């Protein structure tokens, strides 16, 4: 049995972000502005259900407590419910989450919960339907809002909403978002726009620091909360007058990487030690058969020896991440 995943800087890893597809049906300006472009290779190139079962088991036995399914849009997988159920076979995984654009939420969220999904993040970059359409390329604002309501109706106590913070788009809309979460158990997370290989011009035009939002929150009496060991990187704030919470994810902030607790596996089976790192470590040759489980765990744990102390975003180096659908953000 390999001990808890730990790197050379004594960081422990409890959280796996597992991409199950690169495909997305939205065309968000900061991610896939031209829509998903198939690369013409094998349509079965994404991890199969059995491969997902094996990789999740390996991580569970290495101390992983939380798995987040990402994409692309994970719910476009026809076997998405089966994937949820397969990962929930691991009792060590206490939290199983998905990040979704909300397109299929209203229709399917009850099935996801029944299969074992425990947490939900929905991407909503604007509360104005026309602006939502302009950002995503899809006139689906009402459908996504109905999906969030459906999540509450089927038993989710809280929903997280991801909002990419952009100058001249939504950075001046804090009060609108605060009004929305005042009586809703939503954790609204502002995520700083990150530079990717394909998004340099957009980054220069729209990047704004989350510090702007933090100062406004502190001035209005919001209090920062402690983070659990398997939580993501958000700084979370609460206020006694609000049912909802605000999260801030600021990857350009000093020491952002000090508390890194997460690893990534891409939809084609490569282990990525950082969202903005270089080429991943291939795992797929060890996912074909249950007999390779111990070798798989050794490759995962051994790979951590090469994890860098920090990303290099401040230097304009986004590694191999051409867009955020590639590894799953």
From Swiss-Prot:
[4Fe-4S] cluster 2 binds at residues 257, 260, 274. Binds 2 [4Fe-4S] clusters. Binds 1 [4Fe-4S] cluster coordinated with 3 cysteines and an exchangeable S-adenosyl-L-methionine and 1 [4Fe-4S] cluster coordinated with 3 cysteines and the GTP-derived substrate. GTP binds at residues 17, 68, 99, 160, 262-264. SMART domains: Elp3. Signal peptide: none annotated. InterPro entries: Aldolase_TIM (IPR013785), Elp3/MiaA/NifB-like_rSAM (IPR006638), MoaA (IPR013483), MoaA_NifB_PqqE_Fe-S-bd_CS (IPR000385), MoaA_twitch (IPR010505), MoCo_biosynth_MoaA/MoaC (IPR050105), rSAM (IPR007197). GO terms for molecular function: 4 iron, 4 sulfur cluster binding; cyclic pyranopterin monophosphate synthase activity; GTP 3',8'-cyclase activity; GTP binding; metal ion binding; S-adenosyl-L-methionine binding. It is an enzyme of class 4 (lyase). Residues 8-234 form the Radical SAM core domain. Its EC number is 4.1.99.22. S-adenosyl-L-methionine binds at residues 30, 72, 123, 194. One of its GO terms (biological process) is Mo-molybdopterin cofactor biosynthetic process. It catalyses: GTP + AH2 + S-adenosyl-L-methionine = (8S)-3',8-cyclo-7,8-dihydroguanosine 5'-triphosphate + 5'-deoxyadenosine + L-methionine + A + H(+). It comes from the Bacteria. Its cofactor is [4Fe-4S] cluster. [4Fe-4S] cluster 1 binds at residues 24, 28, 31. HAMAP family: MoaA_B (MF_01225_B). Monomer and homodimer. Belongs to the radical SAM superfamily. MoaA family. Catalyzes the cyclization of GTP to (8S)-3',8-cyclo-7,8-dihydroguanosine 5'-triphosphate. This is GTP 3',8-cyclase.
């Amino acid at each position: 049995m390999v001990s808890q995943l730990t790197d050379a800087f004594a960081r422990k890893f409890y959280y796996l972000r597992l991409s199950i597809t690169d495909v997305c049906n939205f065309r968000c300006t900061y991610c896939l502005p031209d829509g998903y472009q198939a690369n013409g290779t094998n349509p079965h190139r994404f991890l199969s259900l059995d491969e997902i079962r094996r990789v999740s088991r390996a991580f569970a036995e290495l101390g992983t407590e939380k798995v987040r399914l990402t994409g692309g849009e994970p719910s476009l997988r026809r076997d998405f419910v089966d994937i949820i159920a397969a990962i929930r076979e691991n009792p060590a995984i206490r939290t199983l989450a998905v990040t979704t654009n909300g397109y299929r939420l209203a229709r399917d969220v009850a099935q996801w919960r029944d299969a074992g999904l425990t947490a939900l993040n929905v991407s909503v970059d604007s509360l104005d339907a026309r602006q939502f359409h302009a950002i995503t390329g899809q006139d689906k604002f009402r459908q996504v809002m109905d999906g969030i309501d459906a999540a509450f109706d089927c038993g989710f106590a809280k929903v997280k909403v991801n909002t990419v913070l952009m100058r001249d788009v939504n950075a001046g809309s804090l009060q609108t978002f605060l009004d929305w979460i005042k009586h809703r158990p939503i954790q609204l997370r502002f995520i700083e726009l990150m530079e990717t290989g394909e998004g340099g011009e957009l980054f220069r035009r729209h990047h704004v620091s989350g510090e702007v939002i933090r100062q406004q929150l502190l001035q209005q009496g919001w209090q920062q909360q402690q983070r659990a060991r398997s939580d993501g990187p958000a700084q979370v704030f609460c206020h006694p007058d609000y049912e909802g919470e605000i999260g801030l994810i600021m990857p350009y902030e000093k020491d952002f990487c000090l508390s890194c607790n997460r690893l990534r596996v891409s939809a084609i089976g490569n282990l990525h030690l950082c969202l903005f790192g270089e080429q991943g470590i291939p795992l797929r040759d060890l996912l074909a058969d249950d007999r390779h489980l111990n070798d798989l765990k050794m490759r995962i744990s051994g790979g951590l020896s090469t994890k860098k102390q920090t990303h290099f975003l401040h230097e304009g180096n986004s590694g191999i991440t051409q867009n955020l659908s590639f590894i799953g953000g």
